[in-house]
C-alpha cells in the first residue's frame, strides 16, 4: 500500500534487492501508511471478529531499537553489475524489548505492530515487517512464526508450479538467496527465517 500511495502522490519509489530505498519523502509516507492506514484497517478487522487488538509501531514503548542500515554492495542479476546502495532511512533491528507486548498479551490484548522503529536518538526507520516479526518471535520465545504473503509460496523454480516447497532447511534458504533464485520481496522473507 505504500507503493500505491506513493504513486498517487507522485513520489518515485526505488527497490533494490527486494528492499525499499527510503528517502525523506518515503519515510513520511511510511509513517502515514503503516502506522495510520494499514494498522487501523487491521485493527478494524480484528474488532469485527471480536478480538481486542491495539495498534503500535516499534517506536511505541521502546519495543524495537534500530540502527540505520549501512550502505551495502548489491548485485544486479540482470546486468551483472555490483553497486553500493544506501537504502536511506532503512533500519536494522538492534534490540527488542518485548515487555510491553507481553503486558498487552497477558491482559487479553493482541498487539499489532507496524514496521517502524527508532534509534536511541529518536530517528525513525522503515524496517522490513518480516524481519520485525522474526525478531519479536525470538524475543517472545514463540513456538512458531507464521509469515503471510501475497505470493503462493516458495518455489525452487518460479516458472514451475510443481517446484513449490512446503519445508525449507536453512542451508537451502541461503542457497536460494545466494544463487539469485530468490528475488524481490522473497529475499527478506527468507532472510528473516535464517
Regions found by a protein language model. Give the residues of each.
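Nucleotide/pyrophosphate-binding catalytic subdomain
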Residues: 1-194
Amino acid at each position: 500500500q505504500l507503493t500505491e500511495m506513493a504513486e498517487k502522490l507522485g513520489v518515485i519509489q526505488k527497490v533494490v534487492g527486494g528492499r525499499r530505498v527510503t528517502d525523506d519523502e518515503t519515510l513520511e509516507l511510511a509513517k502515514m501508511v503503516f502506522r495510520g492506514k494499514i494498522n487501523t484497517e487491521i485493527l478494524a478487522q480484528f474488532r469485527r471478529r471480536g478480538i481486542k487488538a491495539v495498534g503500535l509501531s516499534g517506536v511505541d514503548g521502546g519495543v524495537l531499537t534500530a540502527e540505520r542500515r549501512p550502505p551495502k554492495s548489491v548485485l544486479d542479476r540482470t546486468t551483472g553489475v555490483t553497486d553500493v546502495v544506501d537504502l536511506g532511512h532503512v533500519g536494522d533491528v538492534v534490540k527488542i524489548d518485548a515487555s510491553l507486548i507481553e503486558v498487552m498479551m497477558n491482559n487479553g490484548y493482541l498487539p499489532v505492530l507496524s514496521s517502524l522503529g527508532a534509534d536511541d536518538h529518536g530517528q525513525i526507520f522503515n524496517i522490513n515487517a518480516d524481519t520485525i516479526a522474526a525478531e519479536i518471535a525470538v524475543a517472545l520465545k514463540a513456538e512458531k512464526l507464521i509469515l503471510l504473503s501475497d505470493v503462493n509460496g516458495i518455489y525452487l523454480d518460479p516458472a514451475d508450479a510443481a517446484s513449490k516447497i512446503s519445508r525449507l532447511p536453512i542451508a537451502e534458504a541461503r542457497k536460494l538467496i545466494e544463487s539469485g533464485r530468490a528475488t524481490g520481496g522473497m529475499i527478506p522473507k527468507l532472510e528473516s527465517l535464517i
